[in-house]
Amino acid sequence: MAPINANDINDAKAFVPAKKALPEVDTEGSNGNGITSKGYSYETLLEIANFLLSRVADKPHIGIICGSGMGSYWKEGSLAETITDAFKISYEDIPNFPVSTVEGHHGQLVFGKICGIPVVAMQGRFHYFEGYPLWKCCLPVRVMKLIGIKTLIVTNAAGGLNPNYKVGDVMIVKDHINMMGFSGNNPLHGPNDERFGPRFPPMSKAYNLEYRKIAKAIAKELNIEDIVREGVYTCLGGPNFETVAELNMLKMVGVDSVGMSTVHEVITARHCDLKVFALSLITNECVTSYDMIGEANHEEVLDVGRMRQDVLRKFVSKLVERITQIDANDP
């Protein structure tokens, strides 16, 4: 596939030249690769995008981020197994790409098709608790924008804080509370590059309303309405699970599910003008009382992910198909 540049990639309107020169990226300790502890350069991300596009047949239309246990097991029924004509590339083989270190996160990009529609899936995301700054956790989102996606589907494993939620439920995310942002930890912190998006992007409509309506209709078609919810998600830094006091505070401010990802990815995606749909698989009941028996653990998260693989595979497949249909009718 021919290399891309800032003038012809995707929607040209989203890649206007920056109004003024940005500060140079400090390459000290970076071997001159344009990515350091201080951030990234647009040109370096473009190089990553071209590296990937030179190895695939089709530009993907939709990007998918697979949550814990939902894309990491390449076997029948898994979310990632939905992709046909798959081309897999390890993060370790992609120049300047981070590497996932968490069990249940396989660590590769998978290019291929779902229902004949070109997609790219992340089998393994990057977390703040792994030692990565948030901008680097979200680097793949910017790269996916550059390789052509218009829509990002984000999945995560989350604790159910809403007392009506049960383990195994699927929560459509309608909004989030950026708890990490309250302390100034934001993926957009630092110099802004207007070739990606504006300095102050709005977040009041971060999760596409039409996609959420489609998802509810699909749940009805699949006869899984009884396990599909809609609510508010929040992300904490981890890696420890939350205290009883922390969970009760979150419950008071309207949080329905809590995890360690997604929010910063969605902020970055919206900054890049990507449409977003997100869902949480409720993998454990949050411990909101000192008298409750049991504690959250990562093995439980993976077990529930495996349990719901078939449901998620069908759900996401139909969602990809419907999203593509409605987006094709957009002017």
Identify the meaning behind each predicted range.
Residues 202-249:
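Active-site rim beta-loop-alpha module in soluble metabolic enzymes
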Residues 150-151, 256, 275:
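Short acidic/polar active-site loop segments enriched in Thr and Asp
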Residues 287-331:
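His/Asp/Glu-rich mid-to-C-terminal helical/loop segments that flank catalytic regions of hydrolases
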Residues 144-148, 251, 270:
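Non-catalytic positions within long, well-ordered alpha-helices that form the structural scaffold/packing
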Residues 260-300:
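Zn-dependent metallopeptidase/amidohydrolase metal-coordination segment
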Residues 2-203:
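Metabolite-binding pocket within alpha/beta catalytic cores that recognizes anionic/polar moieties
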Residues 51, 55, 210, 214-225, ...:
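Generic non-transmembrane alpha-helical segments
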